[in-house]
Every structure is written in C-alpha cells, then in structure tokens.
Swiss-Prot record:
Gene name of the encoded protein: hisS
Protein name: Histidine--tRNA ligase
Subcellular localization: Cytoplasm
SUPFAM superfamilies listed in its UniProt record: Class II aaRS ABD-related (SSF52954), Class II aaRS and biotin synthetases (SSF55681)
Nucleotide-binding found in the keyword field: yes
GO BP, one annotated term: histidyl-tRNA aminoacylation
Keyword set includes Translocase: no
Length: 454
C-alpha cells in the first residue's frame, strides 16, 4: 500500500471555504490600497542569494530557504572544502538562489533595478507569499503571505497620515475594533540621551518593548543586566509609564526631552500625525505608546503597531518610516514609509469574531438538478440567464439519483435547488426548493431569478 502523502511542516492546504475567506481579506486590503493610489508589483518567488544574504542579520540568514543548483554542483568544490563540513560555505557553492524571506528586500532590489522607469514618490503594494526556515509552531509557519504597502522617495509626514487612514479603513471594513499604537524612533533616541545612556538605545528599547509581556520588574532587571545603572533606570520609569491623553503625553515629552534635539523632532513629527488623523475623523483608537519599539534596526521615524481590541492575539499590522532603503544595493538617499498587514492573523481574528460576510464566503447559490439529457437541455438556457444576472449557479453534470444530487447541494451549502421534470417543462416553469426552510414553489425563470437574488 502506497504511503499516505503529506506536506512539509510549517505549510498548509486551504479548503475552498478557507480560500473564500482569505480572498475576502486580500481583496478588501487590495481595494483600500487602490483607493489611496498604490500600485501593485510582483517579484519572483526566488531571488539571487547575493540579494538576500546579509540583509537580515546572522539569524535571518540562517532562516533563508536556499535552492540547490541543478547539474553537477560538486564541480569546482575541493575535497578540502567538503571535509571542512562548513555548511554556510558549502551552501554558497551549491546554491545561488533562495526563496524570498520578506517583501522589503525584493522591493528595494526592484526600485534599484527599475529606477529609470519609476515615477517618484513611488506608491507600491505587494500581496505575495514569503518563506522562512523557522521552527513551526502555533501561529508560526514556514510559508505565509505578507500584504505590504510602501511609499518611497518622499519625506512628507502626509504619507504617515495616509497609512493610519488606510489601517483604519481596512479594519473598519472588516468590522474589527483596533488600537493603532504610534511611537517615533527619534523620541526613543531622545529618551536614551536624557537618561545618559545614548549608546544603549537598542538595549533600552528592546527591554521596554517587552513591558506588556514581562512586566516592569522584569524590564528593570533586563536593563540592569545590560549594564544600565540604577540612576538611569530610575529616570526612565516615569517616562515609559507616562499616562494621559496623547496631547498630555506630548506636552510632558516636550519638557522631558527639552535638551534632546532628536527627541523634540520626534515629538514634533508625532504631534503632526496625531493631530492630523484626529482632524480627519479616524474612527479607530490611536494612541502614543512610548514602549513601542518594533523594527529598531531599520526604522528611523514613526513606528506603527495595530492590536485587535476584542481578541487576544499579537500584532495584526505594523510598519514605520525608514531611511536609505536602497543603500544596500548602492542607491543612496531613498527614504520611505510602509505598513504590512498580517493576513494569517487577520484570518484568525475574523474567524473568532465570526465577521465574514455571507456573500464573501458563499459559493454556488443555485443548483439545477439533472434528470437526463432532455431536462438538462431545458435547464441550460435558464442557467446561462441566471449567470448573466450575476447568480453563482451550476448544473449537476450527471443524471444521478436525486438523493445524491441533494446531498451534493447540502455538502456545498447551496441555498437553492431548481428541479425540472416533465410537468415543469410542459408548463415552462421550474420547482425551486429553499434548502434552508425546505419550502418548494413552482416558478417561472424570471420569478426564480427574483427569489434567488432577493
């Protein structure tokens, strides 16, 4: 007996119902991207390893899926190199390509390659899968989709304002209540400066970013373990625990960061974003959160993170401002800002809250039962007519037993079934059965259409 087939760990199959839900998510996000003037690009699933390596740090490089060269890949490799068992070095000999790890580095490569064809500022979006050789666990996969929108070639804070509006609109369409948290890398820099630990900004922000997860006491312990003196930790406490409205926090920061040029610039930028989105009537909760420190290695200005208010789950969207996106490919001076929507987590949130519209996940709306060639020939013109009216309809392809055809309709959750026999054909009508209520009625083709579309 043949072994039962399987799929690689960290990957998934999606059923027709699951795909209908996923496409609803992708289409909703895509529609909002279009509404704000973003244009779609796609990049290859595989990139040259020279494009990918060194862009994600040592740990990130280890998570790249590398593609083995075809042909005699041992050619040119010495016995000494083989015996060294240096996996990284040998991989560079065996593999010249890898699966993309994210959409950001391929986007940077795209901008550099096509800079003479692009009009700047360039507003682009991508909805494509990425791959990471991570250890699979709940909520973490080796293959998953990213939905990214970035605008490059502009320093204007209006771009940040638009991104907040886009986040608000996307989750408004989904019916999900969210909190949009905002911070600024310059504010974090200013905080590190005024407590006298400017060179420890990464250690400080990595620690305070964990405040919600591990609590203040453990954050302080981590700061101390990084060599930050107690005096500096004491100065930090009232800042990271700052409460009140966004306006009150900003006013306090103007005083606290008065001696930090970078810090005050961050406050100014945050104030503009917060005041503008408020004036524009953004419906979601927007909060200045000084503990937010995601992506510190590459974000240089505003930082965003989005949390669902009614479901316990991690970040479902995030992003920020970065400088010199294309610098790693020799094209300097390209600033940008972007966000990414976590499609897989949004999928889970909508499932938990049961927020998928019926029309988004329903498949066939009307099934024509097939009793034979004569009956099928009668049904086909009507089937064509209802499809032209926008009704998702099909005819059972075989003249099988009625029980089997009705079972098919039940399995696919088809709400209406059209039954045509000798009597219906003689009268120019159909029997329409409502599969939810069990009611049947004799109707004309026009009446059938009106009932199904109601």
């Amino acid at each position: 007996m043949a072994a039962k087939p399987g799929i690689p760990k960290g990957t998934r199959d999606f059923s027709p119902v699951e795909m209908a839900k996923r496409n609803y998510i992708f289409n909703t996000i895509r529609d909002v991207f279009h509404l704000f003037g973003y244009q779609q690009i796609e990049t290859p699933s595989m990139e040259n390893l020279s494009t990918l390596m060194g862009k994600y740090g040592d740990e990130g490089d280890k998570l790249l899926f590398k593609i083995q060269n075809s042909g005699d890949y041992f050619n040119g490799i010495t016995d000494e190199e083989l015996l060294s068992r240096n996996a990284v070095k040998l991989a560079s000999k065996f593999c010249e390509k890898g699966l993309r790890y994210d959409l950001t580095v391929p986007f940077a490569r795209y901008v550099v390659m096509h800079r003479d064809e692009i009009s700047f500022p360039f507003k682009r979006y991508q909805i494509q899968p990425v791959w990471r050789a991570d250890r699979p666990q709940k909520g973490r996969y080796r293959e998953f989709y990213q939905c990214d929108a970035d605008v490059v070639g502009s320093n204007s804070l209006l771009n940040e304002v638009e991104l907040v509006q886009m986040i608000d609109r996307v989750f408004g369409k989904f019916g999900v209540r969210v909190s949009i948290k905002i911070n600024n890398r310059k504010i974090l820099t200013g905080i590190a400066e005024i407590i006298g630990e400017a060179d420890k900004i990464v250690d400080i922000t990595v620690a305070i970013d964990k405040l919600d997860k591990i609590g203040l006491e453990n954050v302080n312990a981590e700061l101390a373990s990084k060599g930050i003196p107690q005096e500096a930790i004491d100065k930090l406490q009232p800042i990271i625990l700052l409460s009140g409205s966004n306006e009150e926090k900003l006013e306090t920061l103007k005083t606290v960061l008065a001696t930090s040029e970078a810090g005050l610039k961050g406050v100014e930028e945050s104030e503009f974003i917060l005041k503008t989105v408020s004036a524009l009537g953004v419906k979601s909760e927007v909060e200045l959160d000084l503990t937010l420190a995601r992506g510190l290695n590459y974000y240089t200005g505003a930082i965003f993170e989005v949390k669902a208010l009614d479901v316990q789950i991690g970040s479902i969207s995030g992003g920020g401002r970065y400088d010199n996106l294309t610098g790693v490919f020799g094209m300097d001076g390209m600033s940008g800002v972007g966000i990414s929507f976590g499609a897989d987590r949004i999928f889970d949130v909508l499932n938990q809250l049961d927020l998928y519209p019926k029309e988004a996940v329903n498949g066939t709306e009307l099934l024509f039962v097939n009793f034979g060639d004569k009956e099928a020939a009668y049904c086909l013109p009507i089937l064509t007519k209802v499809r032209e009216a926008g009704v998702r309809a099909e005819i059972y392809p075989d003249a099988s037993k009625m029980k089997k055809q009705m079972g098919y309709a039940n399995d696919k959750q088809i709400p209406f079934v059209a039954i045509v026999g000798e009597n219906e054909m003689n009268e120019g009508k159909l029997t329409l059965k409502n599969m939810t209520t069990g009611e049947q009625s004799l109707v004309t083709p026009d009446e059938l259409l009106a009932v199904v579309k109601a």
